[in-house]
Structure formats: C-alpha cells, structure tokens
Amino acid sequence: MARLKDYYQKELVAKLKTELGLDNIMEVPTIKKITLNMGVGDAAKDKKIMTFALNDLTAIAGQKPVVTKSKKSIAGFKIRDGWPIGAKVTLRGDRMYEFLDRLITIAIPRIRDFRGLSAKSFDGRGNYSLGMREQISFPEIDYDKVDSIRGLDISITTTAKNDDQGRALLKAFGFPFKS
C-alpha cells in the first residue's frame, strides 16, 4: 500500500473529522483522482516533440498517457482539426497516492524560486489545480536527455464539498500553501 494512502486511512481521517466537525467518517473528503496534462502546441510542426512529451509524461506518471487532439482548425495557431496537440493521464488508486507523495516530498521543493502554493487555485468545489513550469523538477526526468523544458498542469479532484474542506485535506497531506 502507498505510504500516503496508509497515512490518510490511519491518521488523517480521524484528524479531519474532528477538525471539520463532521459526524460520519464517510463525510471526510478524499482525493478521487489526479489528472496531469501537458499541452504541446509545437507538436503540430514536429512530430518528434510529441514523442518526447509522451515519454516525459509516462516517466512522471508511471502510466501511459493519452494523446489529446485539436477539436477544430485554427489558422492563427497553424493547427488543423484532429492534430495531436497535447497529452494527459489520469491517476487513481495507489499510483495516485505514490505520485502525490513524490510531488509533495520531491518535486515541489525542487521548484526554482518557490515561495509556497497559491491558496486561490481552488475551483469552488474543493478541487485544486497547479501548474509546473518545468518537468525537470521530477526525479524521473533525466536533465541531460531533455530536449526542451516543458510545463504541465496538475489537477487534484477531491470529494470535498467546498474550498475550505479541500484546503484542509491538502494541508493535512503536507501541501505547502502560502500563509
């Protein structure tokens, strides 16, 4: 079992239940899924870029990503309908908790000029999104083999009813929010 999943079930559930004033342990918010998205607009010009992006996302997530394709043609961006322009992967279960562990303990502290995560990135329903400017913050990416620095979006979907519950859940997991 993943370290954070074990920690959540044995310690955080009871702590969050009292902290949030909930009656039933089934009301305690959990993390449902984590979605990683990497937009690769340059892939329209060069197909190799998409391969490198897919390899990076596979290494980070530990799971094969799905190629996202453009929905319509946009002349200004020089893309056509159906061209590959990104990649995404959805993590659930043990892989999700293992990724979250690596994100909190290794990747976030390695971000350059890091001063804490913004607490304003909640969507109103307890879900949190953050963007990373460099994929090299993750230990799975070998800096020497990277063709270019790419960012990625990370969306954490929770069962929280509001932002306060979501913030309490992520803070309990150890997310370094700005004070």
Curated annotation (Swiss-Prot):
One of its GO terms (biological process) is translation. Part of the 50S ribosomal subunit; part of the 5S rRNA/L5/L18/L25 subcomplex. Contacts the 5S rRNA and the P site tRNA. Forms a bridge to the 30S subunit in the 70S ribosome. It comes from the Bacteria. The gene is rplE. The keyword tRNA-binding applies. Belongs to the universal ribosomal protein uL5 family. It comes from Francisella tularensis subsp. tularensis (strain SCHU S4 / Schu 4). InterPro entries: Ribosomal_uL5, Ribosomal_uL5_bac-type, Ribosomal_uL5_C, Ribosomal_uL5_CS, Ribosomal_uL5_dom_sf, Ribosomal_uL5_N. One of its GO terms (cellular component) is ribonucleoprotein complex. GO terms for molecular function: rRNA binding; structural constituent of ribosome; tRNA binding. This is Large ribosomal subunit protein uL5. The keyword rRNA-binding applies.
